[in-house]
Design a protein with these regions (language model features):
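Short, ordered coil/turn segments that flank beta-strands lining enzyme active or ligand-binding pockets
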Residues: 150-151, 252
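Non-catalytic, surface beta->alpha helical segment in thiol-disulfide oxidoreductase systems
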Residues: 243-246, 252-277
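Oxidative protein folding and maturation machinery
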Residues: 1-146, 150
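A structural signal for short secondary-structure junctions
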Residues: 139, 160-161, 192-195, 217-219, ...
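Short, internal strand/loop/helix patches
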Residues: 143, 212-248, 252
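Short active-site neighborhood of thiol/selenol oxidoreductases, capturing the structured segment around
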Residues: 153-185, 198-200
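Structural microenvironment flanking redox-active thiols in thiol-disulfide oxidoreductases
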Residues: 178-216, 232-235
Length: 277
C-alpha cells in the first residue's frame, strides 16, 4: 500500500506496479507445454522480460536467469530451449560484464554436470570459451604480465603505480589501432595523466622496427611500451586477445573494473570515478 503522505506517490505507484509485474511475469505460463516454445509469442515474452523488465546489468540478470531455468525443469524441451537462449544472450551481449553470466551459466548447467545433455563438441566449445574469458572477468585481479621494453628492461603490470592503469593491446599494422592509438593519447591520456592515469601498452606482434617507428609517430614514449618477442607470457590466452585494439581498465589494486571499451567510453568511465574528481 502506498503511503498517501509520500512526497511523490505517483513514482512510488509506478515502482510498485513495475515490481509486481516483474515478480509475477511468469505466473500463468505453463512450462510443461513444450509446444509454446515453437511460437513467436514465447520468444517475444523472453525478450521482453530479459531486455525490458530486468535492469540491464550482469548482477541483476543472473538471478532471474537461474530462476527461470529452474522453473522450466517441468519440461525438458522447454528447459533446454530457455537455457540455450540465455547462454547465447549472455555470450553475445554488448553489455559490459555479461561474460561473467555466461561463465556462471556454463559452469552450473554444463561443465559441472556429468550428465549434461549437450553434444560433446558443443561442451568442448563452451569449455574453451569459459577458459578464455574466466581469467579476465571484471572484478578479477588482472593476470600478471612482466614484459620487456625495446631495450630489454622488464616491467610488471601489477607494479604500475597509478590510480588507474589502461592495459592496451595493439599493433602498428592494425587499421583500427592506427585510428585508436593517437586518439587514446590525445583525448584520454593527455587529459587524465595529471590525475593518475598510466598506460601499459602491449605490442601483440613481434616486428620491433615497425613498433619503434609507431611509438615515435604517435608520440607515446611516456607510456610503458612493452612486447613479448618470444610469446612466452601467454598474454593472448590470459586476456582473450584475438583482435586489436583492446582496452582493459585496472584500478590501483590492479583489479579489472572495465574492459573492451572504446576510447570515448573509457574516458567517460574514468571521469565518473570518485578517484578522478
Amino acid at each position: 500500500k502506498i503511503d498517501p503522505r509520500a512526497k511523490n506517490p505517483d513514482s512510488l505507484k509506478w515502482v510498485y506496479k513495475y515490481n509486481y509485474i516483474k515478480n509475477h511475469y511468469w505466473d500463468n505460463f505453463n512450462f510443461a507445454r513444450a509446444g509454446l516454445i515453437r511460437t513467436p509469442v514465447f520468444q517475444e515474452k523472453l525478450n521482453t522480460y530479459f531486455k525490458n523488465m530486468i535492469l540491464q546489468m550482469p548482477d541483476s540478470l543472473i538471478g532471474p536467469m537461474i530462476q527461470l531455468i529452474e522453473k522450466a525443469k517441468k519440461n525438458t524441451e522447454v528447459n533446454h530451449y530457455i537455457f540455450l537462449y540465455l547462454l547465447n544472450e549472455s555470450n553475445q551481449s554488448q553489455i559490459m560484464g555479461m561474460d561473467k553470466d555466461f561463465v556462471l551459466l556454463s559452469e552450473k548447467y554444463v561443465l559441472q554436470d556429468p550428465k549434461t545433455w549437450l553434444d560433446t563438441a558443443v561442451v568442448s566449445k563452451i569449455r574453451e570459451r569459459v577458459n578464455a574469458i574466466k581469467p579476465n572477468l571484471i572484478g578479477n585481479i588482472a593476470p600478471e604480465l612482466k614484459l620487456q621494453d625495446s631495450e630489454g628492461n622488464y616491467y610488471s603490470l601489477r607494479q604500475m603505480n597509478a590510480k588507474f592503469t589502461l592495459l592496451y593491446f595493439w599493433e602498428p599494422d592494425c587499421s583500427h589501432c592506427q585510428k585508436t592509438t593517437p586518439i587514446l593519447y590525445k583525448d584520454l591520456y593527455q587529459v587524465l595523466k595529471s590525475k593518475g592515469i598510466e598506460i601499459y601498452a602491449v605490442l601483440t606482434q613481434n616486428n620491433k622496427e615497425k613498433w619503434m617507428k609507431a611509438i615515435q609517430e604517435y608520440n607515446i614514449q611516456a607510456w610503458t611500451n612493452v612486447w613479448d618477442p618470444n610469446y612466452s607470457s601467454n598474454f593472448r590466452k590470459l586476456y582473450d586477445v584475438t583482435s586489436t585494439p583492446i582496452i582493459y581498465i585496472l584500478d590501483k589494486n590492479k583489479r579489472i573494473v572495465a574492459k573492451r571499451l572504446d576510447v570515448d567510453s573509457s574516458l567517460k568511465f574514468l571521469q565518473a570515478q570518485p578517484e578522478m574528481k
